[in-house]
Structure formats: structure tokens, C-alpha cells
């Protein structure tokens, strides 16, 4: 099976044979992936002119209801994702965090609409009088940026990595271009196919790159946003790229971390705190083989 890319509102085959992707447990070939032939500049423009335009005219309430509808749609299809997730080397517990945790992010962000107005913008604070008699006032409003959120994600959360980020930019009124880690992108592609087939999102709200992103970051501008999850060395290299610096593109990096859990002296064996400590440490060193970015390592 050759994975496809979703760009410009349609599914597109990359050129060439592509990178082979294997079942982590059996070594069997699952799919091949390539993004060769994609015009990243055209994808960015499509996101800005079509996806951004469609999302920014929606109110926060409409965007929130959209997220909830999408979450319910994906939740009904979760068993299909579990079966594919096993091929990534994930256990049922690993997959639960990735799949249902990711869908849960859609629900959580959908609920935030209750704190926001039924408007496409948010008024910040109170109006401030700037002249005698109130003939000149100032009032800040928050509006969506006029660009695209580019998400470069890690291999160990092919569903969560996409949904936790996209939920935020969709609620804020921005479209996304998702670049999952190629090794497990076959699971991301299946979820994106269902999202596209649901017709819940407006045109241009989501695009997918299965394969190398090559020159994508060389074409983003100051209206775009980039998020990266992965190693610190790769993240720093991307964040320091000339175009990112020149255009002052917001770059959010979630990279290597070292997390610890501390047991108080009074939490002796037999106390609820000690039992909870053991339970949490066991979970953190076994889920995803202890390789979650938030895993307890000390």
C-alpha cells in the first residue's frame, strides 16, 4: 500500500517508490510513503486563502461544536485505529493514550467554547478612553492569524500528536498542515481519511504530508505558526533556519525532557502515597517503553 498525501483538497500520490514502512512486531511491509512532487508553497497558499478564510469567519461556538462533532465521529471508529496501531509496536494501553487521548483533546478544546463569545473574535479587557470626552478610545481584540499552523510530529503519538495540536488551531480559527513522523504515518493517514470523509471540517482546514517535508519551512511566513515535537537537536536546527528567523515565525518546540518523581520522607510503605508512587512509576517506565516525552526517568 502506498500512502497518499492530502493537499489542496484532494488525495495525491507522491512520485517515486517511497520509503518502506514496516510492522514493528513482525517486520512485514505495511506501506510506503513519499511526498515527492508536492508543491509546499501551493499547499501553504491554499491553507491561507481557503482554509483560513473558512475558519476565521466561524464563531468560537461554531468551531467548538465542530470539534465536538469530529470527536464523536472519530470515537465511533476507534477500534479500527487500535488494529492499525498494533503495527507501530504499541500495546493496547499505549494505543489508548494515543487514540482516545487524542480524541479527548478534541472534546476538551470543544468545551472551552463555553468561555468564549459567539463571535469570530475575542474582546480583551475593557475599552480605554484615550481622549477627553470619550471621542477617542482603544480596545484590543484577538483575531486569528492569517496563516497556517504547520505541525511536525513525533513517531510515538501518530494520533494524539495531530489532534492535540489541531484542536487548538481549529478553535482559534487557523488551518493546519500536519507532517507526522514518516515511520508511523500510516496510522495518521487512516485517521485523516476519516476526518476528510466526515465533511465536518471546512475546505482547507487540514492537509497531510506523508513523507519528507523538505523545503516546507523555507516557505512559511510571519502569519504562520510552526510546532515541533521530537529531539532537541533537530528542533533547534529547524528553529534556527534562516527563513524562520527572518520572518519571525512563532516556533513552539516540545523536545527532550528529564522528568522526575519525588517521594516525601513521610510517604512510607503502606501509605496511600507510597502505593500511588509505585503505581505511577511502573506506568511511566512501561507505557510506550518509557519513551513518552513526559515519562518519569528519575
Could you say what each language-model-derived stretch is?
Residues 83-100, 214, 256-259, 266, ...:
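Flexible, acidic loop-helix segments that line cofactor/substrate-binding pockets
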Residues 1, 143-149, 172-174, 202-204, ...:
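Short coil/turn connectors at secondary-structure junctions
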Residues 27, 63, 173, 206, ...:
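Residue-level signal for inorganic ion chemistry
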Residues 138-139, 206-227:
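A structured beta-alpha segment of the ubiquitous adenosine-cofactor-binding alpha/beta core
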Residues 1-134:
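N-terminal Rossmann-like NAD(P)+-binding subdomain of aldehyde/semialdehyde dehydrogenases
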Residues 198-199, 224-225, 233-298:
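ALDH superfamily catalytic-core signature
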Residues 85, 106, 188-191, 219, ...:
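Hydrophobic packing residues within well-ordered alpha-helices of enzyme cores
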Residues 118-202:
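Conserved small-residue-rich beta-alpha loop and adjacent elements
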Amino acid at each position: 500500500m502506498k500512502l497518499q498525501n492530502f493537499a489542496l483538497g484532494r488525495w495525491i500520490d507522491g512520485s517515486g517508490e517511497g520509503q518502506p514502512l514496516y510492522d514493528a512486531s513482525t517486520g512485514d511491509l505495511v506501506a510506503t510513503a513519499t511526498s515527492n512532487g508536492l508543491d509546499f508553497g501551493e499547499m501553504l497558499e491554499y491553507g491561507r486563502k481557503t482554509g483560513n478564510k473558512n475558519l476565521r469567519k466561524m464563531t468560537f461556538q461554531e468551531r467548538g461544536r465542530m470539534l465536538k462533532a469530529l470527536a464523536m465521529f472519530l470515537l465511533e471508529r476507534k477500534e479500527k485505529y487500535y488494529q492499525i496501531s498494533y503495527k507501530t509496536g504499541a500495546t493496547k494501553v499505549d494505543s489508548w493514550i494515543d487514540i482516545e487521548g487524542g480524541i479527548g483533546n478534541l472534546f476538551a478544546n470543544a468545551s472551552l467554547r463555553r468561555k468564549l463569545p459567539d463571535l469570530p473574535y475575542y474582546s480583551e479587557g475593557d475599552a480605554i478612553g484615550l481622549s477627553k470626552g470619550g471621542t477617542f478610545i482603544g480596545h484590543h481584540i484577538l483575531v486569528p492569524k492569517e496563516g497556517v499552523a504547520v505541525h511536525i510530529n513525533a513517531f510515538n503519538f501518530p494520533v494524539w500528536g495531530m489532534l492535540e495540536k489541531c484542536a487548538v488551531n481549529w478553535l482559534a480559527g487557523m488551518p493546519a498542515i500536519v507532517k507526522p513522523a514518516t515511520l508511523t504515518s500510516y496510522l495518521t493517514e487512516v485517521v485523516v481519511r476519516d476526518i476528510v470523509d466526515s465533511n465536518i471540517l471546512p475546505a482547507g482546514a487540514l492537509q497531510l504530508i506523508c513523507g519528507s517535508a523538505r523545503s516546507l519551512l523555507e516557505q512559511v511566513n510571519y502569519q504562520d505558526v510552526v510546532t515541533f515535537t521530537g529531539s532537541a537537536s533537530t528542533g533547534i536546527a529547524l528553529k534556527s533556519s534562516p527563513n524562520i528567523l527572518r520572518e519571525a515565525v512563532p516556533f513552539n518546540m516540545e523536545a527532550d525532557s528529564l522528568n522526575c518523581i519525588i517521594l516525601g520522607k513521610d510517604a512510607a510503605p503502606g501509605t496511600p502515597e507510597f502505593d500511588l508512587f509505585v503505581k505511577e512509576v511502573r506506568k511511566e517506565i512501561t507505557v510506550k517503553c518509557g519513551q513518552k516525552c513526559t515519562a518519569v526517568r528519575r
